């Protein structure tokens, strides 16, 4: 367990400066464009998601690590609120309009996260809340935007592996764009989700 704790500390210390830099860059923008700034947004989301999964899966009893994760998510909330891209405020709207559009694979992934043996407080942080809230804040309230967001951003949020994202989740004409986003330093989410399973 000490080894895993050390790994978590190293991971969070390594990622936090990059996260802070992304936050600063986003705050300098007069407004956020879902298309233009999606690289920063996806990196920000994945960094928060990686920190969250590490804390939940490996160190659920460590208050220190949980507080770091909460600080990371609080910064994300601050950016989204201050930049006024929280165009959707109604969770019921998301349930009705966005969730039914998810593929079976995406639903299965959500179920995997939901059914982990977690305390109530951490479970609320992990399952559904981060994903729905992030989608809710990132999606503009226009029906024509929903499918593009689901393909370009939603697949990353739901933890789909990089190769699945490129092969199945993104229109062919957008694949080079997504490869460019991923080349900014975002690693495959599975590397972190599976860390706790290694002996």
Q: Model segments located where?
A:
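Short acidic DE-rich linear segments
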Residues: 3, 180-199
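Short, charge-rich amphipathic alpha-helices with coiled-coil/heptad character
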Residues: 16-57
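Generic structural signal for well-ordered, non-transmembrane alpha-helical segments
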Residues: 13, 42, 46-49, 53-56, ...
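Charged, alpha-helical coiled-coil and adjacent rod-like segments in eukaryotic scaffold subunits
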Residues: 100-103, 108-181
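Intrinsically disordered, low-complexity coil/linker segments enriched for acidic/polar
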Residues: 37, 87-89, 119, 171, ...
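Eukaryotic intrinsically disordered, low-complexity tracts enriched in Ser/Pro/Thr/Gly and charged residues
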Residues: 1-18, 22-25, 29, 198-199
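Extended alpha-helical coiled-coil "stalk/arm" regions
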Residues: 58-108
């Amino acid at each position: 367990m000490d080894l895993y704790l050390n790994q978590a500390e190293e991971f969070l210390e390594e990622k936090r400066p990059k996260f802070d830099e992304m936050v600063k860059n986003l705050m300098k923008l007069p407004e956020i464009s879902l298309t233009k700034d999606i690289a920063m947004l996806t990196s920000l989301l994945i960094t928060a998601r990686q920190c969250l999964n590490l804390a939940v899966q490996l160190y659920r009893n460590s208050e220190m690590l949980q507080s770091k994760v909460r600080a990371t998510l609080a910064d994300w909330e601050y950016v989204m609120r201050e930049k006024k891209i929280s165009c959707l405020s109604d969770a019921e709207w998301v349930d009705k309009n966005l969730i039914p559009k998810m593929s079976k694979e995406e639903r299965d992934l959500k179920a995997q996260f939901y059914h982990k043996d977690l305390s109530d407080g951490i479970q609320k942080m992990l399952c559904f809340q981060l994903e729905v809230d992030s989608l809710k804040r990132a999606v503009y309230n226009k029906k024509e935007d929903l499918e593009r967001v689901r393909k370009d951003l939603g697949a990353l949020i739901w933890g789909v592996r990089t190769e699945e994202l490129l092969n199945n989740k993104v229109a062919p004409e957008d694949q080079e764009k997504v490869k460019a986003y991923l080349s900014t330093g975002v690693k495959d989410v599975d590397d972190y989700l599976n860390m706790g399973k290694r002996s």
